[in-house]
Amino acid sequence: MTTVYTLVSWLAILGYWLLIAGVTLRILMKRRAVPSAMAWLLIIYILPLVGIIAYLAVGELHLGKRRAERARAMWPSTAKWLNDLKACKHIFAEENSSVAAPLFKLCERRQGIAGVKGNQLQLMTESDDVMQALIRDIQLARHNIEMVFYIWKPGGMADQVAESLMAAARRGIHCRLMLDSAGSVAFFRSPWPELMRNAGIEVVEALKVNLMRVFLRRMDLRQHRKMIMIDNYIAYTGSMNMVDPRYFKQDAGVGQWIDLMARMEGPIATAMGIIYSCDWEIETGKRILPPPPDVNIMPFEQASGHTIHTIASGPGFPEDLIHQALLTAAYSAREYLIMTTPYFVPSDDLFHAICTAAQRGVDVSIILPRKNDSMLVGWASRAFFTELLAAGVKIYQFEGGLLHTKSVLVDGELSLVGTVNLDMRSLWLNFEITLAIDDKGFGADLAAVQDDYISRSRLLDARLWLKRPLWQRVAERLFYFFSPLL
């Protein structure tokens, strides 16, 4: 009996070390950033079983077998659609401003199409204005309405949008709604999904959370896009979820969420439509390629102004493109660079690009919320402040609520707005969308919004920052070490 017990013990020990060695080898063989690999190895060696389970669950990008197969199957038809779109030469810009040209060339080379011209844009900063405009557009819709959101929280004006969407479906408009399973958990536990389906709306719960499949698909891979397309002509995107901020996270202690949305009219809606069709096919297996833009789709003067490139990320989309776009924007800056984000845990490359811009004389400002709804990200963000301040970057801490806007403005001409936070999750993991806009007029509008944010912010004093307590510095460095995993 003793011999059997000893043998079992040795086999258990051997299996334990083989498991650690196998996971270690898997981490080392994956092409990933060194800080990320080191952080995972530290967790595994300090807390082996917890670390191994965590790595197998969220350490690698698993879309899931079925969705991965759909992603591979959709690309031949999507590539053909994009190639056919090139025949619509009237919608593509032939040149860009000097500051935007490198980024637009990058997007064209990697996505296969040039920037789309002939669009009319409107920046919207008040949730009531966004929802009222959306309700009007829904009421005037003639053919189709397609939406995707990370969060849909019932209550307030969000319910009015839901009612108008159901009314549209009842009068024959083809309505599709895709919502992230984790972000919209309150919605899917409410009566609204059944009400909408009964009205004729196709409602899809994207990336369902299922703990039984935790090792088969990465559970923290989320559908983070916020997009609306109406009649393949009107489109919305930005940082705002389908929530009324007066009813959303009121007990979080961070104030109301402050967002920015762009409402667009023009052929850019078609470019956004192909992104939506890819998401829909990955999730449902159904192909819904949008029609090409009509030759008469551009009523705006000379079909000029507001040239836009859509940049999408996520499994199945061009890898690392949003990260490359942000790097290109930072290195293209000559006069000033203003970045707004609720979560600031950048990659080493992006962090150095920001510091380098400031060190070569560019006026660099970063606007962050003073209070954050994520304690981990909040502490990790502060670990970057000392080097940013030393490089000459201005850090503004917004005090008027949780600033949720994601925006970048370069030299007043190149603007980036969308759903992408400056953190690892947005840069490398989630389904995201960003608009790159080459237009001085839009840049002026965005600058006015950012100036308003700055007027409601406090500039971080470098001298006071260096005098913060030792325990805060220790906490910052601790969370910074794990920042590659956040």
Swiss-Prot record:
It is found in: Cell inner membrane. One of its GO terms (biological process) is cardiolipin biosynthetic process. Its main location: membrane. It comes from the Bacteria. It is a multi-pass membrane protein. GO terms for cellular component: plasma membrane. One of its GO terms (molecular function) is cardiolipin synthase activity. Residues 219-246, 399-426 form the PLD phosphodiesterase domain. Keywords: Cell inner membrane, Cell membrane, Lipid biosynthesis, Lipid metabolism, Membrane, Phospholipid biosynthesis, Phospholipid metabolism, Repeat, Transferase, Transmembrane, Transmembrane helix. The chain crosses the membrane at residues 3-23, 38-58. The active site is at H224, K226, D231, H404, K406, D411. Its EC number is 2.7.8.-. Gene3D superfamilies: Endonuclease Chain A. Belongs to the phospholipase D family. Cardiolipin synthase subfamily. ClsA sub-subfamily. This is Cardiolipin synthase A. The lineage of its organism: Bacteria, Pseudomonadati, Pseudomonadota, Gammaproteobacteria, Enterobacterales. The gene is clsA.
